[in-house]
């Protein structure tokens, strides 16, 4: 797409929109009390956006690294009158300057998931998936995006706990969130918020939210997202949907709360079978009816991925907008007029951590794996991107031997334990000789036990919302059984690269 075509498309889409001359997203977003604010103007910031992952969240595609994707989609994103997108996974080894700069100029902020479909906390075995490989990956992603002012924040996990039975998995997600916050405090020039995006599970809805918001500032989430699809169709309302009950449940919530996914598609269908989504909930979300508790939301989702949630249909370089796109465009144009502090709470009391009950279980947060502690002080090292070894491979019992040239790495991977022996021989200057170093590392055992199996093989990455509509299946939400590799499929070359980072950086401790 050449620049003239890009500009023409932008003007056609924007038409008479009040955002034709969008404000730049050059001011960082900060948190005060239970709300977001523009750090320069001190005006309250309401998240008004869409979830954006062309190709689907289970496919390893980085839409912020491919400039052709950015140039294709940006006019349509602007046309929706949005100020925020959520991106579910990125390649931390790629360059994102052009896309992030274009989004900033268009007045669009980014909320980014740190996990990927191959590097995430597994709901099937959360304890062992919380390891050095996982942390190196999310730290490297922080490094890749920390200098972009229009990064609003990071999600440490997405829908990892999707039933009451696997609620204990939140323990390891919160540990990862804590570690990400510490990494940012030591390795970033600005304090970028870190939060969690939760499935809307009625039995644990409040307990899960309170769990992430409780504790001191070093461990609690900075914000909280809910994936909520309860408002369904033109016959729904503030009370029928249960939104009034959500307002009561979270009236005293202490951190910014927003809908990280919303937009039910269990509605009246068009003649071609596509849903006619009225998006009437937008009128409530961006009003005094909800602004004291909620700070906006993100409609799921921008592109059609075979699940009837898409606002546009993408075919190569061609984008076709739907009736749903036009509906949301008008709703968001009206929502953009809602300003003011929204009766937010400037100094809410810190929440008490929920007690375990028949629905919700938590454990003391595990200590950071010893192999990963050096990343905090020395940095994550080389970003490995989508070629990184999966942390799920470290979750299975496996043994690998890698011998590329003069280096050899013998690694035994057990549940919750990584043992590595690294030997190296070298020749230097006019004299020859060899030196060897042997180091063994064992990750810290979790105080609550060596392992917790938080689900059964019947658990999947999809869930059903309270309204009964089946929501999407997100590859970055957790490691499913298909993401866990056996020893026979363990990728040795990728593991060697990672082991080399540990060895060279001196991060494998005796």
From Swiss-Prot:
The keyword Acetylation is annotated on this UniProt entry: no
UniProt keyword annotation of Signal present: yes
Primary localisation category: secreted
Keywords, in A-Z order: Cell wall, Cell wall biogenesis/degradation, Disulfide bond, Glycoprotein, GPI-anchor, Lipoprotein, Membrane, Secreted, Signal, Transferase
Region annotation Disordered: where it falls in the sequence: 424-456
The organism's place on the tree of life at top rank: Eukaryota
InterPro entries assigned to the protein according to its UniProt record, in alphabetical order: Glucanosyltransferase, Glycoside_hydrolase_SF
Membrane topology: Lipid-anchor; GPI-anchor
Residues bound to (1,3-beta-D-glucosyl)n 1: 88, 158, 300
Binding-site positions, (1,3-beta-D-glucosyl)n 2: 159, 200, 205
Glycosylation sites: 147, 216, 252, 318, 337, 397, 491
Family: Belongs to the glycosyl hydrolase 72 family.
Protein name as catalogued: 1,3-beta-glucanosyltransferase gas5
Organism name: Schizosaccharomyces pombe (strain 972 / ATCC 24843)
